[in-house]
Every structure is written in structure tokens, then in C-alpha cells.
């Protein structure tokens, strides 16, 4: 497509989405749930075909020299597809919040005032790699009564097209409009520029991908953006703590999977437990090939660990999102220094404390300025599915509208409802 055709194409998608959004907003819960259950069924019925489409994307990605963490994000394994199907079913089982009126109160004038939860309208989703985002976005759009326009990365085009066909089939089975969920069918980057500049059609943009993509969208968008830039998450091992539990959680937070934005990239250890904890986690990381970039105090303890991969941390390491088997390690005086470090260098995404001290836990929960804060749990739990939201559209580190994993509620807004019996203002 040339520039003119791209503009015409995206405006057509926008108009179709805007038109469909009215019907999506009115759809009864039973109809939306029917579409979600149909989508779950279709995902399970088409695992082999979907993996065939996905294999072509993987082959192209490797041939193009795409970094292994990015290739990993492209994979549509049976486990990934089953998680998507379960997410659809979980959403279908959840109450429909659209149309709920809350906080209704009678005023001295006689009128009653409350707020009704309504869909945002149309959201645009721009994402890289992970084709499962197509299903997560589509299912949340359906449940929340929105229409959406999805623009996946060129590296996942075959997978995204195959998944979008299943979404269209599920919408049709439920009697919902075919344009309720639309995938941008071109990989031309000009389509992104058009999509983020159509406030007449699109109410919010949600970018999900690398820092470069999100910075570009944030700078150029003419509509509101729900986003997070980095996933520089921390695990802080406090004094006192259960050392065995801390080793297990710190291991999971880093090594369960390296590519997600909720993997821990920084490990902070209280000085009082460092000599006991660091050799144990060092041995675990050494066995898994994780490089530890530490402060001088941490390195002095870790050098005695057989096979450990060590490097001296630089200032840049404290802010780095590695998405790889690398973790920064710093010994701190205690909870106050840990909180200060996290708030200075972290990305306000997810941070955890491992402790047996209730007051330290409460201080951490209160003072760490992140979208998710955890006590004695892995940062890998920062996920809409794990939080019981069903699928998630993304994770927001902003403080307005939505913060943390964005599920159904994050794709809605509140409008004021006033009920009267002929009252007039005096």
C-alpha cells in the first residue's frame, strides 16, 4: 500500500470500529460470554493449524537474526494456547460490570446521583512479538463491550492473522458485529502512525512492546495512551527472612522465564542476611547460567561460589531491564535503603519484599511507588491472569485511569447518572 491507501485503509478500520462499538456496548452478557466460550473452543480445536502458522513466523524471525528473547515471545506453544483458552473461559465466568451503577446517593435537592460503568468505546492495541496478545486483547474487548483495532508486529503476522480469523468466527457465532475486533492486515509501519492519530474514531491507544515502540507512541499519539516503558522489577531479601523461601522465590522471580516484563532484574539483599543468602542463591544462579552483576560487597561474598558468573555492576546496571539471564545484585543496609533504591532506579512496575517482619512488609507496601508491590511472593505473579482478571490487555505504570495489570475495569470509564422526579434547580 502507498501512503494514501494506508490512510484510507486505517480510516476505514476506524469508522467500522466506531460503528461496531455501539452494538458491542449494548450486547447482553450472555451474548458476550457466548463469543468468549466459542473462542476458547476454537483455540483448542485449532492448535495444530495455529502452530503451523506460528512456525512460519518463527522461521522468518530466526532467519532475520532476531534476538532469542524476542523469538521466545513469538512462540504459540500448546501451553500458551491453553492459557489463552482458559483466559477466555475465566472472563466468561466473571460478572458483567457494564451498566452497573455505584454510589447512588440522594442529594438535598431530591435528585439521586451515582455513576454507571460503561465501555471506553474503541481502543487501539499496538504490540510486538507475542501473538497471544491478539487473543488477550480481543477477549477483553468483547467482555468489556468495546470495539478494538489490533496492530501486531510484522514478525508475528501469520500467527496474528490466524488468531484473528478465529476471533471473527467466534463473533459471528455469537451474533456480534464482524468489525468489533479488527486486525490491521498490513505490516507497513505507516499504519501505526495513522492509528494513533485518529481521535475521531479511537478513544485510547495501548502499546505493548519494547521501550522504543512505547516512547514513539507516547510522543506521537493524538489520543490518550495506557502504557509502561520498562519492567525493571526488584526482589528485596530482608532481615529477617526465611532464607530457604527467599532462595526459592528469588530463583523463580528471575529464572522461571527471562523475557517477561515482570521478571526480577534486580536483587537487593539486607546486610544482615547477605552472608547466608548470597552463597545459596549464587549456587542456584550458577547452575542455571545466570550472570550476577554485583556491588563490591556482594561480589566479595559471591566469589567463593563454584562456577558463578560475576561482573562488577555499573551505575547503568541498576536501571537495566535485561530480559536475559543476568541480574544486578546489591547489598543494602535494610528496608529503608532498599525502598530508596527501588524508587530511584526501578520502573514502577512490580517489586517484592521477602521478610518475616510485619512492620517492614507494611512499610514496603506503603512506600514503594510501583503498580504492584508484593510480600513473600515472586514478581512473576504480576499478571492479569494470576490476579484473577482473566486476560490482561497490558500493565500500566501510569497513575491515572489504570495502574498495574489492565483487565476489564481498566477498559471502562464511569459516567454520571442523575435520577429525578421533576426537580428543578433554585
From Swiss-Prot:
- Give an example GO cellular component term for this record: cytoplasm
Keyword set includes DNA-binding: no
List localization entries. Cytoplasm
Q: What GO MF terms are annotated?
A: glutamate-5-semialdehyde dehydrogenase activity; NADP binding
The job of this chain, per UniProt, is described as:
Catalyzes the NADPH-dependent reduction of L-glutamate 5-phosphate into L-glutamate 5-semialdehyde and phosphate. The product spontaneously undergoes cyclization to form 1-pyrroline-5-carboxylate.
Q: Name one Pfam family in it.
A: Aldedh
Catalytically driven reaction(s)? L-glutamate 5-semialdehyde + phosphate + NADP(+) = L-glutamyl 5-phosphate + NADPH + H(+)
**What lineage, starting at the top, does this entry show?**
Bacteria, Pseudomonadati, Pseudomonadota, Betaproteobacteria, Burkholderiales
Protein name per UniProt = Gamma-glutamyl phosphate reductase
From which source organism is this entry?
Acidovorax sp. (strain JS42)
Q: Please give a single GO biological process term from the UniProt record.
A: L-proline biosynthetic process
Keywords (alphabetical) are: Amino-acid biosynthesis, Cytoplasm, NADP, Oxidoreductase, Proline biosynthesis
Q: Which HAMAP family match?
A: ProA (MF_00412)
Q: Which E.C. number(s) belong to this protein?
A: 1.2.1.41
What is the top EC class of this enzyme, as a single word? oxidoreductase
Annotated pathway: Amino-acid biosynthesis; L-proline biosynthesis; L-glutamate 5-semialdehyde from L-glutamate: step 2/2
What does the similarity note say? Belongs to the gamma-glutamyl phosphate reductase family.
Q: Which InterPro entries match?
A: Ald_DH/histidinol_DH (IPR016161), Ald_DH_C (IPR016163), Ald_DH_N (IPR016162), Aldehyde_DH_dom (IPR015590), G-glutamylP_reductase_CS (IPR020593), Glu-5-SA_DH (IPR012134), GPR_dom (IPR000965)
Q: Does the keyword Amino-acid biosynthesis apply?
A: yes
Amino acid at each position: 500500500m502507498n501512503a494514501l491507501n494506508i490512510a484510507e485503509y486505517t480510516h476505514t478500520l476506524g469508522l467500522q470500529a466506531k460503528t461496531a462499538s455501539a452494538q458491542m456496548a449494548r450486547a447482553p452478557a450472555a451474548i458476550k460470554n457466548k463469543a468468549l466460550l466459542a473462542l476458547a473452543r476454537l483455540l483448542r480445536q485449532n492448535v495444530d493449524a495455529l502452530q503451523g502458522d506460528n512456525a512460519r513466523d518463527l522461521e522468518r524471525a530466526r532467519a532475520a537474526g532476531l534476538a532469542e528473547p524476542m523469538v521466545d515471545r513469538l512462540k504459540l506453544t500448546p501451553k500458551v494456547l491453553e492459557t489463552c483458552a482458559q483466559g477466555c473461559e475465566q472472563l466468561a465466568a466473571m460478572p458483567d460490570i457494564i451498566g452497573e451503577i455505584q454510589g447512588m446517593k440522594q442529594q438535598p435537592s431530591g435528585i439521586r446521583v451515582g455513576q454507571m460503568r460503561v465501555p471506553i468505546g474503541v481502543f487501539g492495541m499496538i504490540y510486538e512479538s507475542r501473538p497471544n496478545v491478539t487473543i488477550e486483547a480481543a477477549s477483553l474487548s468483547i467482555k468489556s463491550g468495546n470495539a478494538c483495532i489490533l496492530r501486531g508486529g510484522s514478525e508475528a503476522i501469520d500467527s496474528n492473522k490466524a488468531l484473528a480469523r478465529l476471533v471473527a468466527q467466534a463473533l459471528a457465532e455469537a451474533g456480534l458485529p464482524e468489525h468489533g475486533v479488527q486486525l490491521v492486515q498490513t505490516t507497513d509501519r505507516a499504519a501505526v502512525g495513522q492509528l494513533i492519530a485518529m481521535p475521531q474514531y479511537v478513544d485510547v491507544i495501548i502499546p505493548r512492546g519494547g521501550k522504543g515502540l512505547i516512547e514513539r507512541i507516547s510522543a506521537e499519539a493524538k489520543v490518550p495512551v495506557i502504557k509502561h516503558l520498562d519492567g525493571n522489577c526488584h526482589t528485596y531479601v530482608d532481615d529477617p527472612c526465611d532464607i530457604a523461601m527467599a532462595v526459592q522465590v528469588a530463583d523463580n522471580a528471575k529464572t522461571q522465564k527471562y523475557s517477561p516484563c515482570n521478571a526480577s532484574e534486580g536483587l537487593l539483599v539486607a546486610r544482615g542476611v547477605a552472608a547466608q543468602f548470597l552463597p545459596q542463591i549464587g549456587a542456584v544462579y550458577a547452575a542455571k547460567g545466570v550472570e550476577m552483576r554485583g556491588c563490591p560487597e556482594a561480589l566479595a561474598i559471591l566469589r567463593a561460589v563454584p562456577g558463578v558468573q560475576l561482573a562488577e555492576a555499573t551505575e547503568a546496571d541498576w536501571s537495566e531491564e535485561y530480559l536475559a539471564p543476568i541480574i544486578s545484585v546489591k547489598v543494602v543496609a535494610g528496608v529503608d535503603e532498599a525502598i530508596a533504591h527501588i524508587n530511584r532506579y526501578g520502573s514502577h512496575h512490580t517489586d517484592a519484599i521477602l521478610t518475616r517482619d510485619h512492620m517492614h512488609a507494611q512499610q514496603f507496601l506503603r512506600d514503594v511507588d510501583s503498580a504492584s508491590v508484593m510480600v513473600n511472593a515472586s514478581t512473576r505473579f504480576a499478571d492479569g491472569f494470576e490476579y484473577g482478571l482473566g486476560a490482561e490487555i497490558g500493565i500500566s505504570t501510569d497513575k491515572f485511569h489504570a495502574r498495574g495489570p489492565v483487565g476489564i475495569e481498566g477498559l471502562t470509564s464511569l459516567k454520571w447518572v442523575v435520577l429525578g422526579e421533576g426537580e428543578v434547580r433554585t
